[in-house]
Amino acid sequence: MQLNSTEISELIKQRIAQFNVVSEAHNEGTIVSVSDGVIRIHGLADCMQGEMISLPGNRYAIALNLERDSVGAVVMGPYADLAEGMKVKCTGRILEVPVGRGLLGRVVNTLGAPIDGKGPVEHDGFSAVEAIAPGVIERQSVDQPVQTGYKAVDSMIPIGRGQRELIIGDRQTGKTALAIDAIINQRDSGIKCVYVAIGQKASTISNVVRKLEEHGALQNTIVVVATASESAALQYLAPYAGCAMGEYFRDRGEDALIIYDDLSKQAVAYRQISLLLRRPPGREAFPGDVFYLHSRLLERAARVNVEYVEAFTKGEVKGKTGSLTALPIIETQAGDVSAFVPTNVISITDGQIFLETNLFNSGIRPAVNPGISVSRVGGAAQTKIMKKLSGGIRTALAQYRELAAFSQFASDLDDATRKQLDHGQKVTELLKQKQYAPMSVAQQSLVLFAAERGYLADVELAKIGSFEAALLAYVDRDHAPLMQEINQSGGYNDEIEGKLKGILDSFKATQSW
């Protein structure tokens, strides 16, 4: 078959008419230097602060320095094979992580990818890691408690839903243990938990996950991990990623608790990034915006009002407030709470629980120093019974500390002073508690009532622990309905007082101490 020139020209015209030109514009640049996880890129004219930059090998970097003729970015992940001259391009997106109920019970990395070997994560969408904290009008005052299960904390340093309470102390003083027990105590409270591990050993995190699983708390918890072996960028971003996952519950009228363990390591990772980006160093070589690093994170922990939740859910959730409670952890060096990062975080948070090495080594665990530990807003959230019974405990300990210091110099003490010292010692002994053994409100109330009303006066100091164990076993066996009532209502009146008194009288009558 032969084609003539007319047919050929017609075919060419048809092909030209069918040809569809699709031009894809993208902002492309070239890597000019790579050093310690920081890359400098030339040619990205329209790059945003915090934008994700696509790198070869399906990796990303985040733009942190926008300069006149170059962009400084940190690589999220391995960077050994990146080289000068490689092409990169802008994505037009800022970093987002998966959020939703499907993450509960899972261990994920900073980017929300599963690392527990249980298959892909089910999620309800993505949320930006950086978000603006709710404004003053959108917030509600803190008036509901978060029970940690520790007598020393729930009585003297109460924490409310939506509060930021700092846990501060030297290494090996029980900071993580306190936070993990707080998570374990939320098993049946309905509070969802997020545990963010920053710069820790993988073996330590594995142990924490195992303990949560053993105590039935993992199914209620999201574990976000940036180990010590991961890049500084992932350690710096991990708390923001965990916060975005916690905000999912807060914004839908639920309560969540987030632990940042610990923010000292995040500040060190950020310092490393800033120095590599050639930002000017300040005090302790930290950059000038290290306060903002933590304030913008911790301000996102809040109790939001009914209107905020209704507006966010477009009317699907009505009449509910949401909260995100934060327990950031800071590690001090030789008890120096006046260092740069500790003072910053103390000024941002609503109180601090100070754990002391000397107390820990002398067997007082949790090693809470009641003198400088404080909760600025939690008192309003305390249950009625705890508020009534805890006042005398703090006073007794304050008097005991004062007299204990004085009694070292005085040889003979009068009876009143000796009684106060004895009572203070017994209260200190009573506030000791084993790890992974959180107590209910009713159990704590009964024990505090015994201390407050002088039922420990004739109990030897060495037998306080066994007295408490026997008392709790006795009430669980013979007075379970009353304990259940106190746990549910948290109320305190003459009737409950009379019943508690009756329990202790009958217990002491049946057993000799």
UniProtKB/Swiss-Prot annotation:
Its main location: membrane. NCBIfam families: atpA (TIGR00962), PRK13343.1 (NF009884). GO terms for molecular function: ADP binding; ATP binding; proton-transporting ATP synthase activity, rotational mechanism. It is a peripheral membrane protein. This is ATP synthase subunit alpha. F-type ATPases have 2 components, CF(1) - the catalytic core - and CF(0) - the membrane proton channel. CF(1) has five subunits: alpha(3), beta(3), gamma(1), delta(1), epsilon(1). CF(0) has three main subunits: a(1), b(2) and c(9-12). The alpha and beta chains form an alternating ring which encloses part of the gamma chain. CF(1) is attached to CF(0) by a central stalk formed by the gamma and epsilon chains, while a peripheral stalk is formed by the delta and b chains. Its EC number is 7.1.2.2. ATP binds at residues 169-176. Produces ATP from ADP in the presence of a proton gradient across the membrane. The alpha chain is a regulatory subunit. It is found in: Cell inner membrane. The gene is atpA. GO terms for cellular component: plasma membrane; proton-transporting ATP synthase complex. The keyword Transmembrane does not apply. Keywords: ATP synthesis, ATP-binding, Cell inner membrane, Cell membrane, CF(1), Hydrogen ion transport, Ion transport, Membrane, Nucleotide-binding, Translocase, Transport. PROSITE patterns: ATPASE_ALPHA_BETA. It catalyses: ATP + H2O + 4 H(+)(in) = ADP + phosphate + 5 H(+)(out). It comes from the Bacteria. It is an enzyme of class 7 (translocase). Belongs to the ATPase alpha/beta chains family. The record marks 373 as: Required for activity.
